[in-house]
Amino acid sequence: DRSRSKKVEMLARVFDHCSMKYRSGFRMLTLGWSDGNSFLPVSHSLLSAAEDKNLICGGKQYDGRSLAGRRRLQSRRKATEVMVELIHSAQCAGITAKYILFDSWFSAPKTILELKKQERLDTIAMMKKSKTKYGYQGERLNVKEIYSRNKKRRGRSRYLLSVLVEIEKDGESLPAKLVFVRNKSKRKDWLVLVSTDISISEEEIIRIYGKRWDIEVFFKACKSYLKLVKEYRGISYDAMSAHVAIVFARYMMLSVAQRENEDDKTICEL
């Protein structure tokens, strides 16, 4: 958040989903790795505005082949595109994972298909209750229509409904499992998870997706205790990116220390 700034390099108008207002600043897209015991930030990108109308201040001109040039070009791309780029870079660096977890903001069919086809990674994510249609029993239905047509599980089951669908986009398709669960904050409402690994159980899908909460804890720690927002107030885009990397390094040291002090049996796994 740089609401009072005017000359910050690559500064843009970004939508704050908490206050439901536009603010001046950046969106920090973060890729992290977790084994269920520890969370480590892997990479990030400070996203500016994809559209010129939302760009407040431009950036310095660099050769597009240089790191500074590539970083600025990346900041102007869509978050879904940058997410795939960060995952590809992490895999090229030797950082592997079994599943990619993300919320409904990134769960478009195109993104899920791209991760499976290009990166060979299965996805477990929250889905939007949008008009996006999926192949189900020979028909094209959205999640609301699928939910309304099926009988729900009763009692204290961890999920309400589980169905197999086909995620389709641009002539390509991918089998997936949709798991409908109760919304704890609104008992009459429901949420839907998707997994492209249809071999695992519904309980396992719910358990694995719960690990995504680690990144929310990470954001809270960085903002509240590691001075992510207020320590650096300069105008250089490169310096801001470096500051974020320093904050991430601080969190990594804390994460390793916590692992060694609290869970001796997992030291050799890190």
Whereabouts are the PLM-identified features?
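Short amphipathic alpha-helical "interface-anchor" segments enriched in bulky aromatics
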Residues: 1, 202-233
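Active-site-proximal, Lys/Arg-enriched surface segment
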Residues: 1-50
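Short, conserved catalytic/metal-binding motifs centered on acidic residues
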Residues: 1-3, 31, 100-106, 123, ...
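Short helix/loop capping segments that flank catalytic or ligand/cofactor-binding pockets
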Residues: 3-5, 41-42, 110, 134-135, ...
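Short acidic, low-complexity segments enriched in Ser/Thr/Gly/Pro
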Residues: 44, 50-67
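Charge-patterned, long linear interaction tracts outside catalytic cores
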Residues: 178-200
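Basic, amphipathic alpha-helical segments enriched in Lys/Arg and hydrophobic/aromatic residues
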Residues: 228-270
